[in-house]
Swiss-Prot record:
Keyword set, alphabetical order: Cell inner membrane, Cell membrane, Membrane, NAD, Quinone, Translocase, Transmembrane, Transmembrane helix, Transport
Known EC number: 7.1.1.-
Main location: membrane
Membrane-spanning residues: 25-45, 61-81, 99-119, 149-169, 193-213, 257-277, 285-305, 312-332, 355-375, 391-411, 432-452
Source organism of this protein record: Flavobacterium psychrophilum (strain ATCC 49511 / DSM 21280 / CIP 103535 / JIP02/86)
Entry's Gene Ontology cellular component terms: plasma membrane
MF annotations from Gene Ontology: NADH dehydrogenase (ubiquinone) activity; NADH:ubiquinone reductase (non-electrogenic) activity; quinone binding
Protein name: NADH-quinone oxidoreductase subunit N
Length: 455
């Protein structure tokens, strides 16, 4: 609970910095504040409890995922200084919004009451609507903001309807009371209908098939840093929340729900990777890649043991690789209307360090050994084999092979084609973020138990 309070206070401090004309200090102060909050959050790992009549719950799940969210936010805030260099008068707004977005993320994995869950998801969603349309002079950004707002509002409405049905069936928003009632009596059909509505709404937020159609256009039109936020932080927050909802509200999974999860996972893996093969725009490609990774993460709901730790590890590997990827993409595609693969031509010769980092990030997402992306998929598929979901394992392997095709399109462009443009000097912060993210990615691959043993 204190973590959420400190994050909210830091967001207010970021906004106040503008009043005192301390724009240059906003990013450093925010990063230091986030690192301090990260340390405090870790200290709560073994101090479990609930607050405000169980509105907020501190447990190992919430602490572990909140720590991951804080780390990703540190990277995003660090990238903000250079990305918003031409909009210095608004940097406090953008940084403040990212911090408030983090507060919504923490609330979404720490809730003990469905009303707090909905409050968290709205704080996160509204922050993203603003960031998606933040480039007011760009029509694509305006379009992305409007599409994301409409689709997000639709998903929020479905989630709220599901919560209402659950409340109508149980008479409570409190998860503990709902769980006690589930174990002591049979529920009317609308309780399970409410769970299905919750599932549909969260799948919209995660962008899985068949609720994915908004993602490519929104990712392409949004500013690159906002796309990075959506595809890393927002996606893993929604996935962690979905996991908590399903495991708490359905302590014994129904076979019909499992079939829905299997169909969504398989369709997302296949369609995401097949559609990514056809893309020439890097952000659209990453949108479809994210859909396929969402399919992998959704399949953790089928596991009977070590599901939470597997999801945490996969989310960590995916998000950190995504940060390294976008640190390079933001530099290469700066001031370009279209972020095509041709923009990366010759990067291996002109900027070998960035090319190497981008290559490693892409290989990690493809599931190539040594990097953490490989171990994330390996641990997940190994657990799926034990639960006898062999069809999901087979499709996951096929889709991983397909993904190599479009990831290598970028790698080939970097190392085999000549550059058609002269790029400016690489901002130091982009290099630092990319290098640190890559080091964390490799460390996760070499020492997976550090994360796997947290849950």
């Amino acid at each position: 609970m204190n973590t959420l309070i400190y994050i909210s206070a830091l967001g207010i401090l970021s906004l106040l910095a503008e009043i005192f004309n301390a724009r240059k200090a906003i990013v450093p102060i925010t990063i230091i504040g986030l690192l301090a909050i990260f340390g405090f959050n870790i200290s709560e790992y073994n101090h479990l409890g609930s607050y405000y009549n169980n509105m907020m719950v501190v447990d190992k799940f919430s602490v572990a995922f909140s720590s991951l969210f804080i780390i990703i936010t540190v990277f995003l805030v660090a990238l903000s200084h250079e990305f918003y260099k031409e909009q210095k008068t608004k940097i406090s707004d953008y940084v403040g919004i990212k911090v408030f977005l983090l507060s919504g993320a923490v609330a979404m994995v720490s809730f003990g009451n469905l009303s707090m869950f909905f409050l968290g998801i709205e704080v996160l969603s509204i922050s993203l609507y603003i960031l998606a349309a933040s480039n007011r002079l760009n029509l694509k950004s305006n379009e992305a903001g409007m599409k994301y707002f409409l689709m997000g509002s639709f998903a929020s409405g479905i989630i709220l309807f599901g919560i209402c049905l659950i409340y109508g069936a149980t008479g409570s928003f409190d998860l503990n009371k709902i769980l006690i009632l589930i174990n002591t009596q049979a529920y009317p059909q609308w309780y399970y209908i409410g769970i299905v509505f919750l599932l549909i709404g969260m799948l919209f937020k995660i962008a899985t098939v068949p609720f994915h159609f908004w993602a490519p256009d929104v990712y392409e039109g949004s500013p690159a840093l906002t796309t990075a936020t959506m595809s890393t932080l927002a996606k893993i927050v929604a996935m962690a929340t979905l996991y908590k909802l399903v495991t708490v509200l359905l302590p014994i999974q129904l076979y019909s729900i499992q079939i829905i999860i299997v169909c969504v996972a398989i369709a997302s893996m296949l369609l995401g990777n097949i559609m990514a093969l056809r893309q020439n725009n890097v952000k659209r490609m990453f949108a479809f890649s994210g859909i396929s990774h969402a399919g992998f993460m959704v399949s953790t709901l089928l596991l009977t043991s070590n599901a939470a730790s597997t999801l945490l590890y996969y989310a960590s590997a995916y998000a950190i690789a995504g940060i390294a990827f976008f640190a390079v993409v933001m530099y290469v595609t700066k001031d370009k209307e279209n972020e095509t693969i041709n923009s990366f031509n010759g990067l291996g010769k002109t900027h070998p360090l960035l090319a190497g980092i981008l290559t490693a990030a892409l290989l990690s997402m493809a599931g190539i050994p040594v990097l953490s992306g490989f171990f994330a998929k390996f641990f997940l598929l190994n657990q799926l084999v034990y639960t006898d979901w062999l069809i999901v394992v087979f499709v996951a392997i096929i889709s991983s092979i397909i993904s190599v095709g479009y990831y290598f399109k970028i790698i080939i462009a970097m190392y085999t084609k000549e550059s058609e443009q002269t790029l400016p000097n690489v901002p130091v912060m982009y290099q630092i973020v990319a290098v640190v993210a890559l080091i964390l990615n490799i460390a996760l691959g070499l020492f997976p138990n550090v994360v796997l043993k947290l849950l």
